[in-house]
Amino acid sequence: RKAASFYSKEQIETICKPVFGSVQLGECLKQYCGDAEAQIDFCGVCTGICVISNVMIAKAFVPEERVCVIEKACACVTPESHRTAIEAMKTCQVDIQ
C-alpha cells in the first residue's frame, strides 16, 4: 500500500487472476503505455511460474517497453529454479535489476 500512495488512483489497476499469467495485465499495459515510453517492473513470490508468466505476457503485449525484474524481490521453490528463471528472462531481453 505504501508504494501505491505515490500514484494517483487513476494509475492503479488491481487485477485478480485465477491462474499464473494474466492476459488482463497485458491488455492494461497496452492501454496505459500508449505512445509514452514506460518501464514495467516485476517482483513476486515464484520467479519460475508467476513472475516469468506475467513478464512474458508484458513482453508480448508491449514489446517495445522496458520490462524489468527486481531479482532480490523475487523467490522460487529452490535457488536453482530461481536462477534458471532469471536466466530465461535475460535471454528474452528482460532487464534484471
Which residues make up each language-model segment?
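Active-site-adjacent betaalpha module
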Residues: 1-97
